[in-house]
């Protein structure tokens, strides 16, 4: 849970990209990153144990494709390694180090430097950070579409996951402006980050299998058994990648500027209406979330988002122009 909160804080720093100067943002991002890494050791082993269970079940309750006895033996060795690593708990020194890092960061907050000299109100405070996160995720997704899923490296998939997770954290911070619509985006982003998170863990398990030393007494059957195990894991990974890629197509269907323009309009409507207690009228962006009654589609095909698409032309450009004039 601590690591999740640290990631959320890093997403918040990225969201303030338009006004918090790069040096300040970079310094604090490194602090939060290093704090998370300090806490990651035993958690990483526990995550891989959970991934093993998703793939093959437990020793007592195996599941999935029936493993050859050689494959089952290899998985048993990997499981023992991970159980030993996961048993190591965080030391008092590590916890104290993280506490000191965060306390030091908190004392610096009053001295943070903002690019404009003041904290501006309005959605453009957040637009640059949102657009940057969305754009990076979209760029990496489009690379996969261009080169083909089978040619994408593990590092590229991991980057797509990181950007989807970051955008999800950022939209959670903004979800009050239109809960039903933004929850649909958040759910889709979670599906991408969870699916590619499993893929990443499965890749690490494959690496551990490859790192197991061969014995001089290993037979050809034992070597083939290891290869069959790797192929079994790879089939699961391909299904996860295909599912995540399909979700990413829905998330990144818009150009970054259009995505931010639409979110800016949502912000303005929320700020000028619902948040101030003004009468809740049906606007060009669709019904109030309380009236929607169902989850919206992140693609814009749902009722509310499709209405927003149809009306963020002149009205949306006017809203955005006003916001930019403030920034």
Role assignments for model-derived ranges:
Residues 1-295, 300-317, 323-327:
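Cationic, histidine-enriched alpha-helical/coil surfaces that engage anionic ligands
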